[in-house]
Amino acid sequence: MAKPPAVAAAAAAAASEELSQVPDEELLRWSKEELARRLRRAEGEKVGLMLEHGGLMRDVNRRLQQHLLEIRGLKDVNQRLQDDNQELRELCCFLDDDRQKGRKLAREWQRFGRHAAGAVWHEVARSQQKLRELEARQEALLRENLELKELVLLLDEERAALAAAGGAGGGGGGAGSRSSIDSQASLSGPLAGSAAGSGARDVGDGSSTSSAGSGGSPDHHHHVPAALLPPGPHKVPDGKAGATRRSLDDLSAPPHHRSIPNGLHDPSSTYIRPLETKVKLLDGDKLPPQQAGSGEFRTLRKGFSPYHSESQLASLPPSYQEVLQNGPACPVPELPSPPSTVYSSAGQKPEAVVHAMKVLEVHENLDRQLQDSCEEDLSEKEKAIVREMCNVVWRKLGDAASTKPSIRQHLSGNQFKGPL
């Protein structure tokens, strides 16, 4: 059984110590055999120790070799991990740069969204303001039109009253022969007697003139100025037939025309009729495009009484004469202003009516300019884009109002009128 290396080393050390500790006198007393035996034993122990030391060295070298291999493997692993770490670091830098770019782009989009929303909101507010201004202007125009209509009716009533007073003062001589004609004139107006008898004729300046014939004589004809008669041959009606025709014409006329005399030679009547026709045509222009044609035709027909429509047709353009006689085959074009020759002189026009005509012309010019400027501002495509953007904004506001009560309460104040 071999001794352990530590035990052998300890024994060799002990033997050497024993030999070194033995004094020289003791060594001299030993015999040669004893010295040789002790020497051989010490050499054997030394050889054993050297063998054990060599084994230990081989073991240590083997372990060192293993440790070196492990160190190399760990170095390789460490290098690989460092490479992976470097790649991950570069990837993190790339992702961080991408994140920074994404944040910057998001901020840009956010600023663009705020700017676009502000611009859309401003445009919507401006459009709503324009709509409110247009509505207010339309209401003002409607009120002015109503006032002008009332003014025209008041002027007609005043003229009828003045004509009635003049006719009552100048027609006392032929009362017996005008009994039937006066009963018919009560329906058509006091001045109707001037066409069938010797009644007074009011010229608008406060004076009255009478004709020479008797009230019921058939040789007395109604005098009409040549400028107001339609072109072509004219047939003069006799007394009874003319009176009957005028009575039937006045009965078929509109209610507010029955109180207006039919004296076409009167300057006020010559001026009031085209003015009333123009007011009705202005009202007809506000109808939708589908109803414009028939509405203008009805307005034209309504503006002329059956008795004096021929004289007023003569003052209209040929296209309107065909439409009034045959009916509207297509939408009627816009009626121009009545010619100045139809009106009486400026000195005979009432001041209020002249002012009303100036107001009408100013409003017509403003409406035409406003319509042209509105059409030139935006094209149809731009209008469609603005309407779509407004609808998107209102949908967003509706979604926000469904979640936030404050926005719902703010929108319930009717500040805006909803999507276009």
UniProtKB/Swiss-Prot annotation:
It holds the Pfam family CCDC85. Residues 26-92, 122-165 form a coiled coil. The modification Phosphoserine is found at S179, S247. Residues 165-271 are annotated as: Disordered. Disruption phenotype: Disrupted in the hemorrhagic hydrocephalus (hhy) mutant. The mutant animals shown sucortical heterotopia and non-obstructive hydrocephalus with frequent brain hemorrhage. GO terms for biological process: cell population proliferation; cerebral cortex development; establishment of cell polarity; establishment of protein localization; Notch signaling pathway; radial glial cell differentiation. The modification N-acetylalanine is found at A2. Belongs to the CCDC85 family. PANTHER family: COILED-COIL DOMAIN-CONTAINING PROTEIN 85C, RE60986P. This is Coiled-coil domain-containing protein 85C. It comes from Mus musculus.
